[in-house]
Amino acid sequence: MIPQSNPTAQRRSGDAQNTNNVAPNSVATTTDTALTASTQSGSSSNNANKKLEYIGVYKIGPEIGKGSFATVYKCIDTTNNKAVAIKSVYRSKLKSKKLLENLEIEIQILKSMKHPHIVGLLDYKQTTSYFHLVMDYCSMGDLSYFIRRRNNLVKSHPVISSLLHCYPSPEGSHGLNEVLVLHFLRQLSSALQFLRDKSLVHRDIKPQNLLLCPPVHSKQEFIDGEFVGMWELPILKIADFGFARFLPSTSMAETLCGSPLYMAPEILRYEKYNAKADLWSVGAVLYEMTVGKPPFKAGNHIELLKNIEKANDKIKFPSAAQVPEPLKQLIRSLLKYNPTERISFNEFFNDSLITCDLDDNDQPLETSQMDENLFISEYISPIAPAERSQFFKEQKKNDSVVRSPSPTTATTATPRQDNVVQQMTKITSPVPDDFALSIARNSSEFNLKKDDMNLEKDYVVVEKRAVEVNALADELAHAGAGADAIPNSRKNSDVDQTNRLASSQQQTETASYRRSSSSGSQKRPSFSERRISLSLSPTNALTKAIGLASNRLFGLTTNSSHSNVSAIAEDDDSSTSNNDASSFSTVIPSTNNHVLLQKLNLATIGEPGTEFDLGSVSNLDEQILDKLELIANIANAVNLYADVKFSQIIPSPPSSDGIEDDTEMLPPKIIHMISQEGIGLYIKTLSLLGRAMDIAGQWWFEKYDAVHGERPSFETTVRINQIVQWIREKYNISLERLEFLKSKSDFTAEETIEDNEPNGTTRVQQAIFAAALGIARETALKELLRNSTDIECSYVTSIYMLLAILEDLEESDRQEVKKIIEKINSRLKNFMGK
């Protein structure tokens, strides 16, 4: 699989479409070092232009897509000055025969694909470090980006503005206009029929792999290019054939691949499947086009399969989507659980919705102001770095709108104690008050290891990583290395009890934020009532969440896990209002953390290196295990903070009469702000979890895939697999919550997007930094006031949160954060030594 980022880089130009001059054995004229410099650049666009780097005759432009194995660049063909997309695949990442085979098959398939609705391979070059696939450039991005961001793009993209003016979505619907749906369906079916004639199954059809190009300039050009649909509308093309296979109608496959949300149930069941799996994916994509979201969602593929089975082939459509009955029937015939009951390809291709004539209005869209070389995401202009610090200053003044002073400041301690507390908090974090602002001011100069300055791009990367994360976890589990395969002191009846508790929590919170239950529910609190819980500062909310989850952070023995959780919950209920209790119950992670750290490694935690150094461990497998445990705990700390944001947005069950007063909803600006903060935190969590999976994957390859690999110890294998399974579950749950927050953010973005909205990475860095300091300060207060509850856990969590941002900082800021970590660690050691 060669993941591509959303929106992936490609744009079909009229001249390039007819060239298709594939040169499989040609070699790039530049050195690998030149491209590597461009790849590692914090701003690939500027560096590429300044250094005038080339791949053959192609001038390297800005990075517009990124995955685990490849980076996509917008480039210029200097022979005709046309834009192309170059997908540069890292040779070093393709360490197994299967990955190399996927790439070779993708290249072979693309070389034979010459169809107007399939992304064409124009050229192919390779160097000692990269495979370069030169492909059509689709400047309008992908279908997923178009569906989710059209309310923002309509203000700045001339073609989309004209398109949605002519074909608006139904009022109250998040889906597309019926005409657009049928137009894209016609083009998708044309490409699928071409693949079917060649006995090809794509196996990864999803909105992210359906790319869009601007409309052609005339009806005659449309006819000459053999396009289908309406000539005045955008052109859809299928991309990313990394999973595709030549699969005759009598053949079956059994490889788990593709995006789970659009994956056929027979693939989710690990059963053999045929080309009909693509038809399920088409039905899922068609549903998303009409409704605005996938037909089924879940935190992992197991839950997804359960949801599909539970639906029992009953596909429901929101009334606001106004989906016509023939379209509903087609979608339902595609989304049949049993592939034998699913509509056949011939029936699909001959459906009246596909064969009927679409009425062209012969009125072209407004394209005069469109730059065809400009990528779609570039139409949403980023904030200028100089304006970021101003935003944060203004945000400080406006914080009172959402947050009230910390309840800790209302202590009843004596004046003398107050003075001591103030001194201690200053000692605990002796950092200049403007340190956080220095992070914002210098954000554009951070030495980031990847260009994650755009949260939208990062979201797509982590979304695509979900397939790899689940595949690796499945491989380890099925190899007999799983905890279920051997006896373990931690796997006993108490663990089962803890798992049941975690499962119960997950079911409760899932039912809550999906509004799946309305019986016996209370009316949603008004905004003034909800402000009570929202006014808690993130620090206080996070501290409370940490207290509730302390047994999981420390990996307490399973004998006491259940009782501790119950005791904490009872104590919390007795000290807070019902409203607060219900609010924070959703913060508790539903996964079971008993596989995590059994030790704190305090001797090394105070001197973290840029690569999360763990000190000297003689055994390489133990080093891998310790590194995985540390990164998993760092990710878990950030995830706790993200869950706080999620709990503030999560919807309450509807009232018994099914009526909600619009005045009782949170203002869109606040929803958008909290959602954006949560999105950034979840993306940071997912990037850390993905990093841990990369380490585990490398270990797995060296120990099992390599011919002369030395087998690890039995116990180490089990422990690493336990962490991998925990990471997989945490990754899937975090990704689902991220998608939920994105839906909230996208829905409110039209009313709240402002030019001075801060950079996404800056916002995340500041939020984590401020929360970590806040936890440390409040923990010092609790320690001074002889309140020893969760002191150890809170200090360690603040350290983990600071470690999460350490690598992304430039050297001067990194040294300041290290000093803070050392101070907190010193206080932790003193407390533990008492």
Curated annotation (Swiss-Prot):
A GO-annotated cellular component: cytoplasm
Task: Please provide an example of a Pfam family that matches this protein in its UniProt record.
Answer: Pkinase
Task: Please list the residues that make up the active site.
Answer: 204
Which processes are annotated in GO (biological process)? autophagosome assembly; cellular response to nitrogen starvation; DNA damage response; filamentous growth of a unicellular organism; mitophagy; piecemeal microautophagy of the nucleus; protein transport; regulation of autophagy
Binding positions (ATP): 64-72, 87
List keywords of the entry alphabetically.
ATP-binding, Autophagy, Cytoplasm, Kinase, Membrane, Nucleotide-binding, Protein transport, Serine/threonine-protein kinase, Transferase, Transport
UniProt xrefs under InterPro entries: Atg1-like, ATG1-like_MIT2, Atg1-like_tMIT, Kinase-like_dom_sf, Prot_kinase_dom, Protein_kinase_ATP_BS, Ser/Thr_kinase_AS
**Low complexity bias locations:** 401-416, 513-525
The protein's GO terms of the molecular function aspect are:
ATP binding; protein serine kinase activity; protein serine/threonine kinase activity
Could you tell me the membrane topology recorded for this protein? Peripheral membrane protein
Tell me its family.
Belongs to the protein kinase superfamily. Ser/Thr protein kinase family. APG1/unc-51/ULK1 subfamily.
Q: What does this protein do?
A: Serine/threonine protein kinase involved in the cytoplasm to vacuole transport (Cvt) and found to be essential in autophagy, where it is required for the formation of autophagosomes. Involved in the clearance of protein aggregates which cannot be efficiently cleared by the proteasome. Required for selective autophagic degradation of the nucleus (nucleophagy) as well as for mitophagy which contributes to regulate mitochondrial quantity and quality by eliminating the mitochondria to a basal level to fulfill cellular energy requirements and preventing excess ROS production.
List the protein's name. Serine/threonine-protein kinase ATG1
Which lineage ranks, top first, belong to the organism behind this chain? Eukaryota, Fungi, Dikarya, Ascomycota, Saccharomycotina
